[in-house]
């Protein structure tokens, strides 16, 4: 088995090794070394990337026999090569993974829930728990987790003997029996884990919950740690500052100011809908019963009002009642209704005539078209014909 240098020193950034094997693997090459600093994918954490000799390391996987590095160029078996991991990426992941251990340990000790899923993604960290917690409860955990960071307690890794392991209490999703690597965050968590971690909690930096949702009878939470949490804070602070300036209110008053705007918008929409309803009544007064079709091209701001107009107009038309809104330049949206024709069957003919797309029920279809207004009116003036 490949010697795991990342187990010995999680902060080491480069190393030298001997190439034991290099096999073509599609467009990549599978390289096995006598020792490696590259962490293979496992435990919810993606593999390290970086450079190895003159090749880029694209992925790393572990098998029962060896750790396999997938590179974009071949390496010569027997050669000594220098490798370097993508350190900023590794450190970010160590911050996140160690932060997850603290949170999971606290959730278990405070509320008795177990971590049943973990994924360290490119932009966020996702954890699943086998029970529900409220947002205030998660904020309590967040406060305790950040207190752990401020205390700067050590994080230790070890491979205890089977005898000692049998006497230990630790978290684990799997039933492990040998070569169990235990990660201990002193006073907060003891967990079986194969991944690199920071050396002390102070290296983690800020820990922040960003969301929670119900998931498979429990909850799924997302967090950010360290550098990622700082970036997120800067971006959100900039957004709040911009909103504060646009609304001419203090940053602490942005939420109530936005709520006032939303209330005003709701009132304006209600008033506009009432005006549209009155306008529909006036439109209908101009219509007369006809054995042919009715076609109106007008401004309909409310889709509900547009449908109401068609519902009323189709009672007067022996053919169809067609309502269009839009412009020749940007195209039109339409709703067409009929009490005498099967519009689902007629949709193909209608759309072909007005360069449209759409469909619906036998009594009503809706869609869009690009034909100009004159062509639309000319078609419906003669539709459906005899």
Task: Identify what each model region corresponds to.
Residues 1-386:
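A glycine- and charged-residue-rich anion-binding loop/surface
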């Amino acid at each position: 088995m490949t010697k795991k240098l990342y187990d010995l020193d999680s902060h080491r950034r480069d190393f030298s090794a001997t190439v034991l094997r290099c096999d073509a693997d599609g467009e990549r090459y599978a390289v096995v070394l006598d020792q490696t600093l590259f962490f293979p994918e496992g435990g919810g954490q993606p593999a390290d990337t970086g450079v190895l000799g003159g090749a880029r390391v694209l992925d790393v996987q572990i098998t029962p026999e060896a750790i396999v590095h997938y590179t974009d160029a071949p390496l010569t078996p027997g050669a000594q090569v220098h490798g370097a991991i993508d350190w900023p990426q590794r450190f970010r992941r160590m911050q996140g993974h160690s932060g997850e251990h603290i949170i999971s340990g606290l959730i278990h000790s405070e509320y008795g829930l177990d971590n049943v899923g973990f994924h360290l993604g490119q932009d966020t960290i996702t954890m699943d728990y086998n029970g529900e917690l409220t947002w205030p409860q998660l904020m309590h955990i967040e406060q305790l987790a950040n207190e752990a960071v401020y205390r700067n307690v050590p994080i230790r890794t070890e491979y205890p003997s089977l005898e000692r392991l049998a006497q230990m209490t630790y978290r684990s999703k799997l039933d492990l029996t040998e070569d169990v690597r235990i990660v201990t965050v002193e006073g907060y968590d003891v967990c079986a884990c194969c991944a690199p971690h920071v050396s002390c909690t102070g290296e983690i930096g800020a820990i922040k919950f960003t969301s929670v949702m119900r998931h498979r009878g429990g909850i799924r939470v997302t967090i950010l740690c360290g550098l990622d949490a700082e970036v997120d804070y800067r971006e959100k602070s900039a957004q709040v500052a911009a909103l504060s300036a646009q609304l001419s209110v203090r940053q602490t008053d942005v939420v109530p100011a936005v709520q006032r705007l939303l209330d005003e918008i709701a009132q304006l929409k209600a008033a506009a809908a009432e005006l549209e309803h009155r306008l529909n009544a006036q439109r209908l007064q101009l219509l007369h019963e006809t054995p042919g079709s009715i076609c109106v091209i007008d401004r309909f701001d409310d889709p509900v009002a547009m449908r109401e107009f068609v519902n009323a107009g189709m009672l007067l038309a022996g053919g169809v009642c067609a309502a269009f809104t839009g412009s020749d330049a940007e195209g039109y949206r339409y709703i067409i209704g009929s009490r005498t024709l099967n519009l689902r069957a007629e949709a193909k003919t209608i759309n072909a005539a007005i360069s449209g797309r759409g469909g619906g029920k036998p009594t009503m279809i809706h869609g869009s078209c690009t034909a100009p207004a004159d062509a639309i009116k000319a078609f419906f003036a003669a539709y459906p014909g005899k």
